[in-house]
From Swiss-Prot:
UniProt function note: Endonuclease that specifically degrades the RNA of RNA-DNA hybrids.
Enzyme type, top EC level: hydrolase
Domain called RNase H type-1: residue spans: 3-144
Main location as per UniProt: cytoplasm
SUPFAM superfamilies: Ribonuclease H-like
Protein residues bound to Mg(2+) 2: D12, D136
Catalysed reactions, as listed in the record: Endonucleolytic cleavage to 5'-phosphomonoester
Cofactor(s) needed by this chain: Mg(2+)
Cofactor comment: Binds 1 Mg(2+) ion per subunit. May bind a second metal ion at a regulatory site, or after substrate binding.
Protein name: Ribonuclease H
Amino acid sequence: MTDKDMIEIWTDGACSGNPGPGGWGALIRWNGHEKELYGGDPATTNNRMEMTAVIEALNALNRPSKITLNVDSTYVKDGLTKWIKGWKRNGWKTADKKPVKNQELWMAMEEACKRHEITWVWVKGHAGDEGNERADGLARKGTDEVRGRK
């Protein structure tokens, strides 16, 4: 796989109220091209939108890829890179024996990751990272659309 096969993705989630109407956004860059994705849910949480952004971005790729995935959510990054193995081993329970929140999304995200080689990068939100700012704008657009504002 060459550098030109490398795909860079930024994802973000937003919520107006938590829970409340929310949106997700993703910016995908590859070989000089870009694709923007976004959507929303009228009743959700910020974490669910962060997770949905990753799932939708990865599922939009039509072949196994080498990806740098930029997220501003430590919940998403740590959940997939550190916590999920323990949750599965414990029957989807946390260390304090409580059910893992958003289990269906963790499972969908793990499945979406399987066919790709992913390097996870945490970026500070609202700190000038151009890709993150674009993903944030898309997530806000998704939120606005489910709230009936264009």
